[in-house]
């Protein structure tokens, strides 16, 4: 029972630029309503009582973060991020060396629901490995021919999931797996892939498909719609 009461720290890698958004401003600083995407993402984490600290890894040349109210928030720590996501996450983990469990959440994923976060955090009661929020694949999936815009074959979707964030792991285990994977030149696309590389099998915790990452211009309007809908539902 005590495991469910442990405080949790979160790491938010926010040093990327997001060139697919086709904007001069990094996507995490684009606004939805009266807040930036980064603020929406961080506030969703801090809304849960177990999340007591959020470490945000930003680019060393970032001048935008200091202009946000987040810069003066007592539960937020800022560190310099790296060139790659894994480097930024490791920098964040160094800042919470005493934490037992850590969340890692995308800076540009502002639509996290509190019930999803609560279900993910609950796995710390019985898991030594952790897990991720994920959404079952619903569309028909095709694998393309290498180097061609042509279908190679249809991929069976029965056991396919979209990996989402937050992802939630024991801090020491995540640190060790990320370090080993990077040192051995493994391709790491998210934190779970580092654990997979080291032979672990994180849990899949089903989350809502509207927990989208803002990656392309059309995602911004969709995220705004989802956030507005959630606010209206909470007020109802």
Swiss-Prot record:
Q: Name one GO biological process term.
A: isopentenyl diphosphate biosynthetic process, methylerythritol 4-phosphate pathway
- Pfam families recorded: IspD
Q: Where is this site: Transition state stabilizer?
A: 20, 27
Q: Which reaction does it catalyse?
A: 2-C-methyl-D-erythritol 4-phosphate + CTP + H(+) = 4-CDP-2-C-methyl-D-erythritol + diphosphate
- Quaternary structure and interacting proteins, as annotated: Homodimer.
HAMAP family tied to this protein: IspD
What is this protein's name? Answer: 2-C-methyl-D-erythritol 4-phosphate cytidylyltransferase
* Originating species: Salmonella schwarzengrund (strain CVM19633)
The coding gene here is: ispD
């Amino acid at each position: 029972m005590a495991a469910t009461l442990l405080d949790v720290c979160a790491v938010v890698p926010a040093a990327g630029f997001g060139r697919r958004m086709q904007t001069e401003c990094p996507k995490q600083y684009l606004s939805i309503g009266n807040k930036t995407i980064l603020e929406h993402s961080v506030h969703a984490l801090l809304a849960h009582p177990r999340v007591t600290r959020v470490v945000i890894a930003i680019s060393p040349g970032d001048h935008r973060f200091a202009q946000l109210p987040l810069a003066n928030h007592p539960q937020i720590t800022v560190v310099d991020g790296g060139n790659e996501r894994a480097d930024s996450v490791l920098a964040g983990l160094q800042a919470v060396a005493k934490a037992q469990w850590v969340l890692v959440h995308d800076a540009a994923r502002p639509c996290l629901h509190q019930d999803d976060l609560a279900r993910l955090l609950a796995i710390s009661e019985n898991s030594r490995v952790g897990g991720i929020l994920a959404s079952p694949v619903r569309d028909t999936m095709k694998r393309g021919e290498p180097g061609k815009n042509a279908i190679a074959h249809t991929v069976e979707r029965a056991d396919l999931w979209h990996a989402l964030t937050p992802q939630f792991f024991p801090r020491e285990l995540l640190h060790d797996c990320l370090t080993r994977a990077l040192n051995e030149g493994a391709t790491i696309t998210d934190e779970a892939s580092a654990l997979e590389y080291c032979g672990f099998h994180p849990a899949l915790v089903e989350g809502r498909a509207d927990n989208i990452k803002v990656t392309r211009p059309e995602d911004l309007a969709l995220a705004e719609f989802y956030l507005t809908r959630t606010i209206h539902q909470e007020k109802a």
